[in-house]
């Protein structure tokens, strides 16, 4: 038996080539594991990002923003500020509501953060108002994971209070029990209650006050322990009729006696079943509704969760009265399914294009089948690893697999092409497989590890962006690694069994024509390369020019954060004059809804009015506009927004701010627009001075649009200026005054009704239907120390003033948020720079600090780390290549190809009108790993020719370029066609995928043309440099 030379022994591939059955079964195992993994993987829009954010909501009906700030928000903030791991704390104190948002470091587990928050709330309990209806409630908030579904419950016959009760006790609980559902929240504020509306004149005529009534009600409705009787033979539990359940029972309550006759509550008040808060409301289209937002559990399959909800809806509807209707207003899975389907189609298209290009070059069906098996096997096998890593099928992981299509086929192409070359020379298929695989094994390892090295810096990206792209980078790395394994095992084994001289020599008309064409191309390339090698300095100047051009393009290209997606949902904020009441705002909201629902692209509309912890004031409303599916409307979301804003501008007295809802949401608070900028000061007075000046400047900038701020300091206040001396003489305290006002105008929750299913409140207020506005204050009566009734007007004057509608804090200091959008002809980078320049012209005092927030802050962070990220990728690849080649020089030759890729990518983005955003930057980093393959294949063969055949460096690199021209062209076109479907994507989520494809296609085209000529020249330059260095060292040693 002939003994094969070392390169012919097959290296690590020999065992697999010689044992085809074992190799086949191993690959089948990988295939089956991948298929099982694919079926087990959850589906989502983006990778799971557990963003440790907790929101603490405290409701105190009737309290002014100032009282909420000092009595509720400030004590809680002081306790929260002592927690470790807290990254940022923001708060919003408005009329009756305090919302504190706690954002923790990404490294802090959410359960630990919850424990710290609960401990801080417990520590602050004694500092909070004693009459707070409910303690602060905290909930986990993940801004990166919005609700998966929004449902509306309406009725044509039942009052909304009964609908709310039914939804809360039956519908919401059933949906919460579905596997995968994490939280169901209700909006609409129509919780049932008994409302007691006092007739101020009636109680005054009887010598009573509202405090007398409140005391009577709270004493008459209790629910406390009563004990039990334990006798010699039996035990008896004690119970009593201490609870009043209905409005009728409260009407009959005796609150006082006068001249021996009972005075019942119904004599001095209107008692009725109503809503706990009459200043809250939600609408679905034009109908008042109870709206349910459903959020999934972390890691749950969003598709199966939504399907389970839809399957349960018919059963839930049957259990409800016929007049009650449950409607799905929005379902995120509709767009997620479409986006994932489009990405999967692009993945299949990429595979088909890659196989087509392989056949075009190899012109042989058996040779085409081999990579046609290797590519899907590598991709499917990746799913098995993804399951163990708790990944999901999402847009980014599918993008990684689509890009991997062009990567993984490279290894198979290089192996097949090398083995085919030996078969064409007359080698037997088995010997050719052993020799070709052994010869190319080191190249495959070099290609694989140098490409994976490029992805390593992505794993160390900070903040939420790094968490997001971790799955992308690891998925791509796993696919590349499996591809290398397949290419060194299955591919040479199949070559040994499927390829032969006859099959390779068998040619049809297409084969002969394409062969002649490739021969002519290679001959032309050889002539061109010879000329280039004869003029190395001209070629070097071209290479240096690309480096300079790439730097210039990097500086001047518009920069952004993430592409704006069209997910079919628009989030809106409606703003009215600061003195607007709930009724006035509800009317304006209905006018705007009528206009919006007339747009042909709008499918449904949800709107909310009232202070509920999300809405900061009565003069604002929230809207969620659900658009028709993309294939059922003519325009993308940005055009629809522009059209809606133009239409709503005709409605007097309102301003509408719209922004498309995104899969990636970093902002922890509801904002009017996409981007935010904050001014923070030590006092509200400083903000009142500088906010208007900055707003005036910013509204004039062409780089910004829809500029607004949450600074609202013109809210109407009726200031009760009490003459303390007069009040003291009458024995009336300030607590008496506050209680009287709270009883009358605060929708005061004074008692609780307990049932087997739920708890309901008793609400006390004055009936102000006949005395609207400030005149209602004239009806307030207080009790003096001698039992007499004293009008409030006799001891106090009412002054009209202005005050903030809400008070916002950032890390315990007053703050104002300025919101803005970016016009189509500008980038976020332009807007950020314009704001910073404007800030410098104002010369703000030292006690005012500014900071970007949300997406804008993340953009600044990502932009600042981008250059270092690319440098880290280059350094990582240099280290890996240096180790593999045991050389300091050859890695530099390989890395010299990178500027050409940068020029191509940046030029393509500018021509396509795309910004240099995070997605495009990922594409450029991937290009770093792709384009160096050309140089690796050239240099490997050149070094082998010098070492084994004794060729000169010039002849060696010239021969290497000609021999590797076809696989270089094949691998580059394969990578290009793998990215082409992303570049041409037009479906749902295309905005996220397209920049990656554009950058990669542009970079590959330019680098392919230039590196075929610049790499050989640089190789020879460094070879001469190495010889010169060695001679200098040798001379020094001789002299020594």
Curated annotation (Swiss-Prot):
GO molecular function: xenobiotic transmembrane transporter activity
Entry keywords, A to Z: Cell inner membrane, Cell membrane, Membrane, Transmembrane, Transmembrane helix, Transport
Induction: The mdtABC operon is transcriptionally activated by BaeR.
Annotated localization: Cell inner membrane
One GO CC annotation: plasma membrane
Top-level taxon of origin: Bacteria
Major subcellular site: membrane
InterPro entries for this protein: AcrB_DN_DC_subdom, Acrflvin-R, Multidrug-R_MdtB
Record field: transmembrane: 16-36, 347-367, 369-389, 396-416, 440-460, 472-492, 537-557, 863-883, 888-908, 911-931, 968-988, 998-1018
Membrane-related topology note: Multi-pass membrane protein
HAMAP family xref list: MdtB
Stated family: Belongs to the resistance-nodulation-cell division (RND) (TC 2.A.6) family. MdtB subfamily.
Cited PANTHER family: MULTIDRUG RESISTANCE PROTEIN MDTB, PTHR32063
Function text: The MdtABC tripartite complex confers resistance against novobiocin and deoxycholate.
Record's subunit section: Part of a tripartite efflux system composed of MdtA, MdtB and MdtC. MdtB forms a heteromultimer with MdtC.
Protein name: Multidrug resistance protein MdtB
Organism: Escherichia coli O139:H28 (strain E24377A / ETEC)
Gene: mdtB
């Amino acid at each position: 038996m002939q003994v094969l030379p070392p390169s012919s022994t097959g290296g690590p591939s020999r065992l697999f080539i010689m044992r085809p059955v074992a190799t086949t079964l191993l690959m089948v195992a990988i295939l089956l594991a991948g298929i099982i993994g694919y079926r087990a993987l959850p589906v989502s829009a983006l990778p799971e990002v557990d963003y440790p954010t907790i929101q603490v909501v405290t409701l105190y009906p009737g309290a002014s923003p100032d009282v909420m700030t000092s009595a509720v928000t400030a004590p809680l903030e002081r306790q929260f500020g002592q927690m470790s791991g807290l990254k940022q704390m923001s708060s919003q104190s408005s009329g009756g509501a305090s919302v504190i948002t706690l954002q923790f470091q990404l490294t802090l587990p959410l359960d630990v953060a919850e424990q710290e928050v609960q401990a801080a709330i417990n520590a602050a309990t004694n500092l909070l108002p004693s009459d707070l209806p409910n303690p602060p409630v905290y909930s986990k908030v993940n801004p990166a994971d919005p609700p998966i579904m929004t449902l509306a419950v309406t009725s044509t016959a039942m009052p909304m209070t009964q609908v709310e009760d039914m939804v809360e006790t039956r519908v919401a609980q059933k949906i919460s029990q579905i596997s995968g559902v994490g939280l169901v929240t209700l909006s609409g504020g129509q919780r049932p209650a008994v409302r007691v509306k006092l007739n101020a004149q009636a109680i005054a005529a009887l010598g009573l006050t509202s405090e007398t009534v409140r005391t009577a009600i709270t004493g008459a409705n209790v629910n406390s322990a009563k004990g039990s009787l334990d006798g010699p033979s039996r035990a008896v539990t004690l119970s009593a009729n201490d609870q009043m359940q209905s409005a009728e029972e409260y009407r009959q309550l005796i609150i006082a006696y006068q001249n021996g006759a009972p005075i019942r509550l119904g004599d001095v008040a209107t008692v009725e079943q109503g809503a706990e808060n009459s200043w809250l409301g939600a609408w679905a289209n034009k109908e008042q509704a109870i709206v349910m937002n459903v959020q999934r559990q972390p890691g749950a399959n969003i598709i199966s969760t939504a399907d389970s909800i839809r399957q349960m809806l018919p059963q839930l509807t049957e259990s409800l009265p016929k007049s009650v209707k449950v409607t799905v207003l929005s379902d995120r899975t509709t767009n997620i399914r479409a986006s994932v389907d489009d990405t999967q189609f692009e993945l299949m298209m990429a595979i088909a294009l890659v196989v087509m290009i392989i056949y075009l070059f190899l012109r042989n069906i058996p040779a085409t089948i081999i990579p046609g098996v290797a590519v899907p096997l590598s991709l499917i096998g990746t799913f098995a690893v993804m399951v163990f890593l708790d990944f999901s099928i999402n847009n980014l992981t599918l993008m990684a697999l689509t890009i991997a299509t062009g990567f993984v086929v490279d290894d198979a192409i290089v192996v097949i092409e090398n083995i085919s070359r030996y078969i064409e020379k007359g080698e037997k298929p088995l010997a050719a497989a052993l020799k070709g695989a052994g010869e190319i094994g080191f190249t495959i390892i070099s290609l694989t590890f140098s490409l994976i090295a490029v992805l390593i810096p992505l794993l160390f990206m900070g903040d939420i962006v790094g968490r997001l792209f971790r799955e992308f980078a690891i998925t791509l790395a796993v696919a590349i690694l499996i591809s290398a394994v397949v290419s060194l095992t299955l591919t040479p084994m199949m070559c040994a069994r499927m390829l032969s001289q006859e099959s390779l020599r068998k040619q049809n008309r297409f084969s002969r024509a394409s062969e002649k064409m490739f021969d002519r191309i290679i001959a032309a390339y050889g002539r061109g390369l010879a000329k280039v090698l004869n003029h190395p300095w001209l070629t070097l100047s071209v290479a240096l020019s690309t480096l300079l051009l790439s730097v210039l393009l990097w500086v001047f290209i518009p920069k952004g954060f993430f592409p704006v997606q069209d997910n079919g949902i628009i989030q809106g904020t409606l703003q009215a004059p600061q003195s607007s009441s709930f009724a006035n705002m509800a009317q304006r909201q209905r006018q705007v809804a009528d206009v919006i629902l007339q747009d042909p692209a709008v499918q449904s509309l949800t709107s909310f009015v009232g202070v509920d912890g999300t809405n900061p004031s009565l003069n604002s409303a929230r809207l969620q506009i659900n658009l028709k599916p993309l294939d059922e409307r003519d325009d993308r979301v940005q055009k629809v927004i522009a059209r809606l804003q133009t239409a709503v501008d005709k409605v007097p007295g309102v301003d509408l701010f719209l922004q498309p809802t995104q899969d990636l949401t970093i902002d922890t608070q509801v904002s009017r627009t996409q981007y935010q900028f904050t001014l923070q000061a030590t006092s509200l007075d400083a903000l009142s001075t500088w906010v208007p000046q900055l707003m005036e400047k910013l509204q004039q900038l062409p780089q910004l649009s829809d500029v607004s701020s949450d600074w609202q300091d013109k809210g109407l206040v009726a200031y009760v200026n009490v003459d303390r001396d007069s009040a003291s003489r009458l024995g009336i305290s300030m607590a008496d005054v506050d209680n009287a006002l709270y009883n009358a105008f605060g929708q005061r929750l004074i008692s609780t009704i307990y049932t087997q299913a739920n708890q309901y409140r008793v609400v006390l207020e004055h009936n102000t239907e006949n005395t609207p506005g400030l005149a209602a204050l004239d009806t307030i009566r207080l009790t003096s120390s001698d039992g007499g009734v004293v009008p409030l007007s006799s001891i106090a004057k009412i002054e009209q003033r202005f005050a903030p509608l809400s008070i916002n804090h950032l890390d315990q200091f007053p703050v104002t948020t300025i919101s803005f959008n970016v016009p189509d002809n500008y980038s976020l980078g332009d807007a950020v720079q314009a704001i910073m320049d404007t800030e410098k012209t104002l010369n703000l005092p030292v006690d005012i600090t500014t900071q970007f927030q949300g997406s804008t802050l993340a953009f600044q962070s990502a932009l600042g780390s981008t250059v270092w990220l690319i440098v880290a990728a280059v350094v990582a690849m240099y280290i890996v290549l240096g180790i593999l080649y045991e050389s300091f020089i050859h890695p530099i030759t390989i890395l010299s190809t990178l500027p050409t890729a940068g020029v191509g990518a940046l030029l393509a983005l500018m021509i396509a009108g795309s910004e240099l955003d995070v997605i495009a930057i990922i594409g450029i980093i991937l290009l770093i790993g792709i384009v160096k393959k050309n140089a690796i294949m050239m240099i490997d063969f050149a070094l082998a020719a010098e070492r084994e055949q004794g060729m000169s460096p010039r002849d060696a690199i010239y021969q290497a370029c000609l021999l590797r021209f076809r696989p270089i062209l094949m691998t580059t076109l394969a990578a290009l066609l793998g990215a082409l479907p992303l570049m041409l994507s037009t479906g749902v989520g295309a905005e996220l995928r397209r920049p990656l494809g554009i950058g990669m296609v542009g970079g590959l085209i330019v680098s392919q043309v230039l590196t075929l000529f610049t790499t050989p020249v640089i190789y020879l330059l460094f070879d001469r440099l190495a010889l010169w260095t060695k001679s200098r060292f040798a001379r020094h040693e001789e002299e020594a």
